[in-house]
Amino acid sequence: MVILFSEEVKLVAENDDAVTSGHVENPEEEQMELSLRPQTLDQYLGQKRVKKEMSIYIKAARQRDEALDHVLLYGPPGLGKTTLAFVIANELGVHLKSTSGPAIEKAGDLVALLSDLDPGDVLFIDEIHRLAKPVEEVLYSAMEDYYIDIVIGEGQTTHAVHVPLPPFTLIGATTLAGQLSAPLRDRFGIVEHMQYYTVDELEKIVQRSSDVFHTSIAPEAAHELARRSRGTPRVANRLLKRVRDFAEVKGEKTISLATTSDALKQLQVDSEGLDQTDRKLLRTMIEGYNGGPVGIRTLAANIGEDMETIESLYEPYLLQNGFILLTPRGRMVTDKAYLQLGLPIPNDN
């Protein structure tokens, strides 16, 4: 494909206000994640199947002295996709360049990134489903045959240049794998689905993070916090920071179960890890639409969230834990949702 060079890539940060959001909220939280980030697969907690498979692929690539095949990581936000990309690069002993789909505004931005890679390096693109179509098309030849075609010069001096690229590994991360085009998806040789973490796995993460934060947490408090963290390490670490604040104000040297429960109540995180937006979504379906079915566009308009946020951030957890069902006609709440909200279950439900 022939494209034009453009200016430098602009990095974009996105914010989310919900304490149980799986998204990174601000630069401070991004720095916190860096401090907690494991360096090796052995240090990486959870995702046992993914770790086992990636360990084999990495060892094989190193033995052949080849670039690792391109990797697609998909699943809800906050499950460690970015962290795993850094771990993979570290295990390979190569450099990693990180960007996101929305940050690559023009095809030339991607060309600049690709041209700066050394043999075997990793290019990590978060939110890869949000790449613009012209940018995505540049990736096809780059991923498959390690080359790009660019146009340089102006007017009569314009000419096309074939630019070979060193063998590299593209790691793409997405919360919405279904939005990837088939041509792009088919070029990933390794596709890994990131699963929600178990309470035991999150408990270990909470204990490890408390050590990094130079604080102490009682085992039963760590368990309760893990239980309400939506199966998501990022949520667990965020809640731990807030609970730590409550404990410090109370003068506790070790975070207790009582303080943890009080703090989570203050933060409006209920016994199942549901937050205000979760409950608003469920109540809207129940009180406005008799429990559903309700279309995603209607839901988004009613609760003031965009459709992508609902689909990537809220629905996966509500589905996984049996609060809603997806039907051909839309979303429906389950009996469990009525019980969690303290509402009577309709006779015909």
Swiss-Prot record:
Keyword annotations of the record:
ATP-binding, Cytoplasm, DNA damage, DNA recombination, DNA repair, DNA-binding, Hydrolase, Nucleotide-binding
- Principal localisation: cytoplasm
Enzyme class, top EC level, equals hydrolase
Q: Which reaction does it catalyse?
A: ATP + H2O = ADP + phosphate + H(+)
Q: Which GO terms describe its cellular component?
A: cytoplasm; Holliday junction resolvase complex
A Gene Ontology biological process noted in the UniProt record is: DNA repair
Record-linked Pfam families: AAA_lid_4, RuvB_C, RuvB_N
Residues given in the record as ATP binding sites:
L36, R37, G78, K81, T82, T83, E144, D145, Y146, R187, Y197, R234
Positions of the UniProt region annotated as Head domain (RuvB-H): 271-349
State its location(s).
Cytoplasm
Purpose of the protein:
The RuvA-RuvB-RuvC complex processes Holliday junction (HJ) DNA during genetic recombination and DNA repair, while the RuvA-RuvB complex plays an important role in the rescue of blocked DNA replication forks via replication fork reversal (RFR). RuvA specifically binds to HJ cruciform DNA, conferring on it an open structure. The RuvB hexamer acts as an ATP-dependent pump, pulling dsDNA into and through the RuvAB complex. RuvB forms 2 homohexamers on either side of HJ DNA bound by 1 or 2 RuvA tetramers; 4 subunits per hexamer contact DNA at a time.
- Note the subunit structure: Homohexamer. Forms an RuvA(8)-RuvB(12)-Holliday junction (HJ) complex. HJ DNA is sandwiched between 2 RuvA tetramers; dsDNA enters through RuvA and exits via RuvB. An RuvB hexamer assembles on each DNA strand where it exits the tetramer. Each RuvB hexamer is contacted by two RuvA subunits (via domain III) on 2 adjacent RuvB subunits; this complex drives branch migration. In the full resolvosome a probable DNA-RuvA(4)-RuvB(12)-RuvC(2) complex forms which resolves the HJ.
What family is this? Belongs to the RuvB family.
Protein name listed in UniProt? Holliday junction branch migration complex subunit RuvB
